[in-house]
Amino acid sequence: LMSANWQMMAMLNILISICGACMMYHTEYADNGMQKMSVLPIRQGSMFFGKFLIAALVLSAMVVIEMAVLVGCAKYWFPSYVFDLTEILKTAGFQIIVTLPTVMLMLVIASACKNMWVSLGIGVILVFTLSILPQDNIVLSLFPFASPYQMLSAAVENSRTALFLAVCGIETVVFGIAEVLYLQVRRCFE
């Protein structure tokens, strides 16, 4: 059931993350909110990571709801289905972790673009470009907008679970560091 539906669910998760990131930063750039927030006694990097935390929590809620729906469908249409909570939690955790680089990169893109439509366009182009790439190529499947399409069952089957978790964790940290550096450079030119 998961393998038949995950591609569409992953695409919806990514599109919702893109829209959320674009709207978060659009509200800051509208009416010069970014300049007003720069005088607050809080670092802009802290605000960015707060936004990332909000986006990660929303993503987690979406994945948990999707897993609950899949379990409900499996129980209804496949009476012989045996509910295994640990397997469902592992799958949900894996899906959240491999999607976090996409969320972080989209927040970085949205913070760099004052026009919401530019960042939204970049995000949508990346989604559809990387969704058509072959998912069996390990290098291409590790790109931020391609990794959410990976499933735990396929990663376990190919012994790539640790690779996906490590690379996605590293990508998330690198994009966070890149945003902090970008904020310092942007502050110099304002």
Residue ranges and their predicted role:
Residues 24-56:
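Helix-loop-helix units of permease transmembrane domains in multi-pass membrane transporters
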Residues 1-32, 133-135, 178:
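Transmembrane helix-boundary elements of multi-pass transport/secretion proteins
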Residues 32, 67, 71-83, 114-115, ...:
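Transmembrane helix-loop junctions in multipass membrane proteins, especially transporters and channels
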Residues 101-131:
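Functionally important transmembrane alpha-helices
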Residues 21, 62, 66, 70-74, ...:
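Structural signal for membrane-spanning alpha-helices in multi-pass inner-membrane proteins
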Residues 25, 34, 69, 73, ...:
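Hydrophobic alpha-helical interface/terminus motif in multipass membrane transporters
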Residues 1-17, 49-113, 153-167:
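Secretory targeting signals
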Residues 1, 120-190:
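Terminal transmembrane helical anchor/hairpin motif
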